[in-house]
């Protein structure tokens, strides 16, 4: 698998669930993801692109086919470029006419023509002419459409001179979605939209959208952003981000406004139903529903569109804050209760545990709250229960936890067992000087896996004034520190060396290139582009061992990605190195 190219840069800055806050850069312009692209129709500008830019929308999407088919727009775009045509300086992505193809059955342009046209008018992110097969089409039809899409992808790959989308199609057949994702992952594209889902979203078939997105994500390389084509209603954003969607586009802000519909994070309301505005955006702060109803239709539609945009933007910001705080699943749980079909989709997403668990951080800033039956199925909770079962059999002394069930008391100081809240109280038994080492060994077994406890045999544990274990030492040398915030172990140099001997290769290893070795030894962070291999079992925020190709220990630190991501990503930090280990 290639490491990609430099037309577009994408790196992950924070994460929760499969959701991520990323930095996307193209043509020297940067945005933070998750991001929403307002759809701009150059023939019907309900909100001017310049105003969108002032509102903080640093990326928009428009339709290159509409521009291509309109002689006046086409000639002007070719003369001055798309940015001057629209009066917008941010990132401009374009669709190719695929949506028109799905809606109306044909478009009067070839794949090569539209790709070359996109380059000539200076778009930042283009899209080739894929075939979006409608839901429930015969499988033979979906297969034939996908065959054409992949042929056009190969053609676009050969001629493209800009960053480009490669949409994953396949109708409602998850095996075709996986196949398309694998094939397109092997090609030189930058972003992967998941296409053909608008009819499903319009019909509230969110459960099927979950299966389509997860099937696609499972086969996609994880270093490329994913765009859920046509998903523009804020009620689905949190769920989609938890699946790993990075980009959205919204025409709904304008379409709903023209129909006197008012967006909220939970759904849509008709303007004539409202006595009060449940919002404090500039529009809702200035006008009452009655005042908007009395306005001329064109002005009313413009103001409703601006409100709808603020609601969309606010929900994206709320999601990003939830990711930062480790609270994304709580937000998804809350939003899912706005509609039975969304609730069904949320439950379906939790069925995809194997996919979700790979990206789920092992520790978070937030406590685990038992707020619903579904919260007991969150990936972090399920994983903690599975790991605890393994440790329980070795350490015994079980206690009943209101969220995690039977857990050895030696894990009850550690995240998430200690950092959790349920209806029933759970008391923590502090260690004694005599049994504190049992706590440390159980934590090691839970944190690093089978037999990791052997690295701490014979060690002594110093207790803090609070009675909690802190420093773990052997013969006066520090092996590890038990972190106050989450009860996990941060390795010292001696602890890393002992763990390295105990754990067979490649467990908890991140293998770096010869070029990165001297920097790792000096305690410098490891960047993903220098990672040659990593233990697939590594999860975000695990404590890991950095080694060279000879399995010589170079450093210890905290993983910022899963093991598989480290191998694929070209940009961003893979390991936050805590301590380097000098050679010799």
Swiss-Prot record:
The active site is at 95 (nucleophile). InterPro entries: ArchSynthase1/Queuine_TRR, ArcTGT_C1_sf, PUA, PUA-like_sf, PUA_sf, TGT-like_sf, TGT_C1, TGT_C2. This is tRNA-guanine(15) transglycosylase. Residues 507-582 form the PUA domain. The gene is tgtA. Its EC number is 2.4.2.48. Exchanges the guanine residue with 7-cyano-7-deazaguanine (preQ0) at position 15 in the dihydrouridine loop (D-loop) of archaeal tRNAs. GO terms for biological process: tRNA wobble guanine modification.
